[in-house]
Amino acid sequence: MAESIIIRVQSPDGVKRITATKRETAATFLKKVAKEFGFQNNGFSVYINRNKTGEITASSSKSLHLLKIKHGDLLFLFPSSLAGPSSEMETSTSVGLKAFGAPHVVEDEIDQYLSKQDGKIYRSRDPQLCRHGPLGKCVHCVPLEPFDEDYLNHLEPPVKHMSFHAYIRKLTGGADKGKFVALENISCKIKSGCEGHLPWPNGICTKCQPSAITLNRQKYRHVDNIMFENHTVADRFLDFWRKTGNQHFGYLYGRYTEHKDIPLGIRAEVAAIYEPPQIGTQNSLELLEDPKAEVVDEIASKLGLRKVGWIFTDLVSEDTRKGTVRYSRNKDTYFLSSEECITAGDFQNKHPNICRLSPDGHFGSKFVTAVATGGPDNQVHFEGYQVSNQCMALVRDECLLPCKDAPELGYAKESSSEQYVPDVFYKDIDKFGNEITQLARPLPVEYLIIDITTTFPKDPVYTFSISQNPFPIENRDVLGETQDFHSLATYLSQNTSSVFLDTISDFHLLLFLVTNEVMPLQDSISLLLEAVRTRNEELAQTWKKSEQWATIEQLCSTVGVQLPGLHEFGAVGGSARAATSAMWACQHCTFMNQPGTGHCEMCSLPRT
C-alpha cells in the first residue's frame, strides 16, 4: 500500500484534512476535496499559495508528487463566487463576512471609500509615560482601533455609538477574523414554504417560527453627524412656522461625506430642503400624495444630491415678545414619540443602506431624522436621530403600534389569526437594582432611538446661491407664496447679477422650471443642471442662449414685470408689439390666455 499523506485544505468555512497518497493524481485528489467540502466538481478552485497562484487543475497525468505537494502542506480553497479577484473586496474585512455577503451589489461611494481606509487612531509619543526613542512604540502610543470604547468615551462630547464601519472592523477583528459573523437583517415574519404542517393559524413549527426579540440599545450608528451647509437653508424652512404657527415637514437633500471627528464616521450634509404637499396644524402633520416626488429625486440626482433624511418642526411659542419657544422634548418627557419612531422606521426601510456584507444586499439605513424643537435655553434647536435596525424590522413587519395617551411608549402587537407576532422583550432595572426582562407591552421607545449630533459649519458652504429676494418655496400657497411665472419674473427682475449661474442656482427655482405645467423643461434642462453641479458659468451661458430660455423670458414678459435685458417687456431681441401678440398670464389667477384678448378667460378679470 502506498504511503499515506495528509493534506490540509483551508476554505472560508475552516480547515479540513484530506487523506491522499503521493502517487494520487490531481483529479482524484480534487474529487476528494469536493466530497469533503460538499462542492460540485466545478464549484471551487484550489491553489498552492494564499494569493491565488499555483492553481491545481484536474489533471489525470500529474500526481501530487510531481506537483511537489508533501505531507502536511496547506492548500487554499476558494468557492467560484470568490475565486476571481475584485477591487471592491480588497479591504481588511474578513473572508467569513465576504462568504456570507452579497458581492455583486454596488455600495455608496462613501462606503467604498471608508472600507479602504486604515481607520486606526494614531497617537504621538507621550513625553511622560513613553520610555523609548522617537521611532519606538509602546502601549501608551501604539495606534488604537477605531472601535476603542475608552477613546470614544473620552472624546468631547463623549461618543455613545461607534461608526458603522468601526463596528465592521470590530466584527472582523480577533483570531477568527469574523468568519462566523454575518450582517443578517431581522425578520419578524413566519418563513414561507414550510410544508410539514398547515399554514398559520392552524400550524407552526420551530423551522418557520421567527425567534423572540430582545431589544438592546444599538452600539453603532450608520450616520454620525448631520450638518446643514448654512443657516439660510434651515431659516427658510422655519419661516413657515414663524408666519403661520403651524408645524411643517420637509425632505433633506444632500450628500454623504466623511465625518473626521469620529473614526470612520459618516456625515449627512444637507444642501436643500424640499417641502412636499402637506396639511399642518399647531399640533399635527398630514402628508399628502406628491405627484412630483420622482421628478424631484431625478433632478436632485443630476445635481449630485440625494434624499438623506426628513425634518419636521415641533415648536410652540412661549413668549412672542422675547421670541422664545417651549422646551418640551427632554429626558422627563420624550425625544421622539412612538408615532415618530414608526414614521422614521418606515422611511429608513424605504431607503436601505446598500451593503455587500449582508446576504440580502442591504443592512440598516443612512436615512436620518431631524427635529426643529425648543432647547433648554428656549431657543430653536435642531436634534438628529435614527431608529435602530430592530425598530426597522418591527415597523417593516407591522409589529409595532403607538400608544395613544403616552407618546413615549410603543406597543408590540399580539398574535392574531391573520398575523403571528414574535414575543418582544426589553431589559430594565427594578426598584431593588436587579436586571429584569419585561414584555414590550408597553415599550419605552428610548430602546429604539439613536441620537445623532446636528451642527452648522463655522465656514458656511453654498451648493446653491443665496439671494436677498429668493424664489418662493414649493407648496406654500397658504402663505400666498406661489410658484408661477409672475413670481419668476419678479425674482429675475430683483436679481440682476451679471453672473447668470448665480441667478439660476436656486434649488426651488430649478424644480419649478422642470415641474411647471405651462413650460416644463424636464427634457432640456440637463445642461443647466450640469452647469449648476460643476459651477460652470460657460455651460450656463450656453443653455441661456437656447430656445427654451427665450420662451421662458417671453412668458415672464407677459405678466407685466420689466426684466433686465428685455426691451419694453419684449423677448430677447423683441419689442412691445411682439409681447402683445404672445400668450399672457392673468395677474389674478395666473391662467395663460390667448394673445389679443383683454380679459382673462378663466376669471373674467381685465388684463391690466
UniProtKB/Swiss-Prot annotation:
> InterPro entries, alphabetically?
MPN, Npl4, NPL4_C, Npl4_Ub-like_dom, NPL4_Zn-bd_put, Ubiquitin-like_domsf, Znf_RanBP2, Znf_RanBP2_sf
Query: Can you name one GO molecular function term for this protein?
Result: zinc ion binding
A Gene Ontology term for the protein's cellular component: cytosol
Pfam families given in the database record: NPL4, UN_NPL4, zf-NPL4
Please list the GO biological process terms of this entry. Answer: ERAD pathway; Golgi organization; negative regulation of RIG-I signaling pathway; negative regulation of type I interferon production; proteasome-mediated ubiquitin-dependent protein catabolic process; retrograde protein transport, ER to cytosol; ubiquitin-dependent protein catabolic process
Q: Which residues form the MPN domain?
A: 226-363
* PROSITE patterns in the cross-refs: MPN, ZF_RANBP2_1, ZF_RANBP2_2
Pathway(s) the chain acts in: Protein degradation; proteasomal ubiquitin-dependent pathway
Q: Which residues carry this modification: N6-acetyllysine?
A: K179
Positions where N-acetylalanine occurs in the chain: A2
Zn-finger (RanBP2-type) intervals are 580-608
Q: Which CDD domains match?
A: MPN_NPL4
- Superkingdom in the source lineage: Eukaryota
Q: Which UniProt keywords apply?
A: Acetylation, Chaperone, Cytoplasm, Endoplasmic reticulum, Metal-binding, Nucleus, Zinc, Zinc-finger
Its domain description in UniProt is: Binds ubiquitinated proteins via its RanBP2-type zinc finger.
The entry sums up its family as follows: Belongs to the NPL4 family.
This protein's assembly is summarised as: Heterodimer with UFD1. The heterodimer binds ubiquitinated proteins. The heterodimer binds to VCP and inhibits Golgi membrane fusion. Interacts with ZFAND2B; probably through VCP.
Q: What does this protein do?
A: The ternary complex containing UFD1, VCP and NPLOC4 binds ubiquitinated proteins and is necessary for the export of misfolded proteins from the ER to the cytoplasm, where they are degraded by the proteasome. The NPLOC4-UFD1-VCP complex regulates spindle disassembly at the end of mitosis and is necessary for the formation of a closed nuclear envelope. Acts as a negative regulator of type I interferon production via the complex formed with VCP and UFD1, which binds to RIGI and recruits RNF125 to promote ubiquitination and degradation of RIGI.
Recorded protein name is: Nuclear protein localization protein 4 homolog
| Native source species | Rattus norvegicus
Q: Which gene encodes it?
A: Nploc4
